[in-house]
Amino acid sequence: MKVTAATRSRARHFAMQAIYQWQMNGNPLHVIEAEFHTDNDMSKVDTEYFHELFHGVAADKSALDACFLPHLKSLPLEKLDPVTLALLRQATFELKNRVDVPYKVVINEAVNLAKKFGAEDSHKFVNGVLDKVAADLRALEFNAARS
């Protein structure tokens, strides 16, 4: 399948849902991933990207959390809405590991998912936190875009 912006967006959509499910029930990754492939039409999804995001977040959860934790304004991780937490982890993974994807694209995709699935106004919180994470992880790209 040809990788497009749309297939990547769908991959992020399903990966965020898979991460959410993993956070909530702790089922093995392969079980959750198999359910997604069985229960959803994945024909228009970049399934390799879905797999990379889902497994990458699970494998690097603590390091990802450490990237955005300083920007939560003293809010403990446990108090975050689970959808917001899944989005922050997924987007931070992309910012950290997929430098081929512009940071603005990563943030915009996360904000759009927060508008669709998150609590009211969570998209503003997600945008603010990820903007700071991008400044930390992608300083050159971030500063070049700001000048």
Swiss-Prot record:
Taken from the UniProt entry, a GO cellular component term is:
cytosol
Instruction: Decide whether keyword Transcription regulation is in the record.
Output: yes
TM spans (from-to) = none
Q: Which domain of life is it from?
A: Bacteria
InterPro entries recorded: NusB-like_sf, NusB_fam, NusB_RsmB_TIM44
Q: What GO MF terms are annotated?
A: RNA binding
- Asked if Nuclease is a keyword of the record, the answer is no
Biological process (GO) annotations? DNA-templated transcription termination; transcription antitermination
Keyword list (alphabetical) reads: RNA-binding, Transcription, Transcription antitermination, Transcription regulation
Family annotation (PANTHER family): ANTITERMINATION NUSB DOMAIN-CONTAINING PROTEIN (PTHR11078:SF3), N UTILIZATION SUBSTANCE PROTEIN B-RELATED (PTHR11078)
For this chain, the family text in UniProt reads: Belongs to the NusB family.
What does the function comment of this entry state? Involved in transcription antitermination. Required for transcription of ribosomal RNA (rRNA) genes. Binds specifically to the boxA antiterminator sequence of the ribosomal RNA (rrn) operons.
Protein name per Swiss-Prot or TrEMBL:
Transcription antitermination protein NusB
The record lists the organism as Teredinibacter turnerae (strain ATCC 39867 / T7901)
